[in-house]
Amino acid sequence: DAVKNANKLFMESGCDCIKLEGGSDVAPVIKAIVKAGIPVCAHIGLTPQSAAMMGGFKVQGKSLEAAQELLDSARAVEEAGAFMVVLEGIPKMLADVITQKINIPTMGIGAGAGCDMQVLVAQDMLGMNEWVPKFAKKFADLHKIIIDAYNEFAKESNERTFPDEATQYKDRKSVV
């Protein structure tokens, strides 16, 4: 089913790859999907779609045993054929070690600057919400801009200054 569903998603969506959350546990699935000719990006550490089962959005790989599991998972997804791996919500030192020990690129989100590349959620980076995760940086404050825009819209609507002449259709004299 995984290969069939991945193929359908890949063919019908126009995406460039399939991203699978999980490490050693999903390596056989990654291998099968890659064998079918579909590129796979793996995602280990804090995996958002299963965060509830991990006790919420918490840093992963803090104990020696958990760190070793993540390193083993990175190696397993690489061996299974993943072309890259997202490292999310793990200590910087662990992300550095994983990046050095595997031969596929790492993409970090809350994993320190040592990964091969970085990614952030647009809403966090653009400040679209009041709260942002510890690892994210607000590069803009769109939350304030959005709230101000809604308040201005409500004000002008209530005052009946919007819509105005420039933003409404003109009546034809023959119709009125």
Question: Across the structure, where does each feature detected by a protein language model lie?
Answer:
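Alpha/beta enzyme core
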Residues: 1-133, 137-140, 144-172
